[in-house]
């Protein structure tokens, strides 16, 4: 493949450097949910952790494949990562809703539960992005599509 923003090397880098976070949260959520039950502790912690992991994933992916978006600034990448993290939290809740509706599961326990999950996912994403700004590398130090 070529050297474009979505070439094979970029895909491999995303898999190696970014995918592990969300995958780890999903695996921990499945195991901890089975061991301890999802409510009242595992589910909230995992939604927050999911927000952290998704913000990490989207920030790394947008940095690695930055050519796809032009030449975004670090703020641009952070804003894109935040928006995509919020979208991921929203679509996760849609999945829970439709699972309850069509598969007869009882994952969502009401509006309060859904709003809590959205708030925790968003908060996890915000915390990651702020922490990455404080302790992370500067824009010039980021390995953007080398």
Question: Over which residues does each language-model region extend?
Answer:
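Bulky hydrophobic segments
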Residues: 1-110, 122-146
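Short aromatic-rich membrane-water interface segments that cap or initiate transmembrane helices
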Residues: 109-117
């Amino acid at each position: 493949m070529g050297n474009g923003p979505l070439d094979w090397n970029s895909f491999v880098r995303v898999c190696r450097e970014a995918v592990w976070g969300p995958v780890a949260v999903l695996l921990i959520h499945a195991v901890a949910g089975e061991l301890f039950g999802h409510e009242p502790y595992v589910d909230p912690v995992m939604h927050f952790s999911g927000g952290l992991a998704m913000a990490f994933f989207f920030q790394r992916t947008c940095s690695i494949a930055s050519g796809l978006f032009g030449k975004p600034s670090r703020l641009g990448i952070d804003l894109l990562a935040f928006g995509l993290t919020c979208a991921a939290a929203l679509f996760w809740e849609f999945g829970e809703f439709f699972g309850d509706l069509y598969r007869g599961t009882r994952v969502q326990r009401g509006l309060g539960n859904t709003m809590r999950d959205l708030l925790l996912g968003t908060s996890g994403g915000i915390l990651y992005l702020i922490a990455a700004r404080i302790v992370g590398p500067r824009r010039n130090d980021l390995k953007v599509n080398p």
